[in-house]
Amino acid sequence: MPALRTLLPHLGLFLCLALCFSPSFSLSNNESCILYDQVYPSDNLINASAEEVSGENTTYTVTVPVNDSVSAVILKAEKDNKPVGTWSGAYEKCNNSVVYNLTSLNNSAFQTNWTVPSSEDVTKVNLTIFIVINRTATVSSVKLEPKETSSLASTPESQTSAMTTAMTSAMTTAKTTAVATNSSTDVTSDNSTAVTTANSTAVTTANSTAVTTAKTTTMTTATTTAKSLAIRTLCSPLAGALHILLVFLISKLLF
């Protein structure tokens, strides 16, 4: 018992020290992945393009220009301060970032893939890239664009071709109809005019001929009838007697 009482103060002191230093330990472990002391903005040409749409996911290929002095590339994709998507390859997690330690470089560019659900609005995702050189990092941001499938990409062209064909056909039909209508109207007008003129001429000629013929026939008939009556009158016996009587009376009066 005396020995236990002697150890209790030391045990309590150890527990207090452990509680006091535990936050610093966790902070040290949490921040141990930070490989840089200073950060500078950069305009490095970072390329992030959607290369493949598989099922319900879209895979983006991220290309980062590097050289022999680059020791690590840190990538972070966040939306509303929360990590989005998954990264490929061998990396270490650091908070909401992934760290790619570059030990050997075979080319002047570092590539990795980032996969995200196709339903995710990538235009609202902040993709940040850190390039670490001698504990100094340059930071760049990339604007992501949604992947357009080939069917969607080819739709405007087919619609344009269909619309162009439809418009051309409609214009051709309209022109043909207009020309045909004008031609029909012209032909109808010409035919109507010709028929009307011909009919009018024929009617006028017929009427004139009929009237002239009727008048001529009537006058000729009347004249012939009058002459015939006169001849008949003169040639009758009564007319002869009257003629003789008239000659006798005239001779008496004269002589």
Swiss-Prot record:
It is a lipid-anchor; GPI-anchor. GO terms for biological process: cell differentiation; negative regulation of cell-matrix adhesion; positive regulation of cell migration; wound healing, spreading of epidermal cells. The keyword Endoplasmic reticulum does not apply. Glycans are attached at N57, N67, N126. The keyword Transcription does not apply. GO terms for cellular component: apical plasma membrane; external side of plasma membrane. Residues 1-26 form the signal peptide. N-glycosylated. Coiled coil: none annotated. It is found in: Apical cell membrane. Residues 237-255 form a propeptide. It comes from the Eukaryota. A lipid is attached at S236 (GPI-anchor amidated serine). Keywords: Cell membrane, Differentiation, Glycoprotein, GPI-anchor, Lipoprotein, Membrane, Signal. Modulates leading keratinocyte migration and cellular adhesion to matrix proteins during a wound-healing response and promotes wound repair. May play a role during trichilemmal differentiation of the hair follicle. This is Placenta-expressed transcript 1 protein. It comes from Rattus norvegicus.
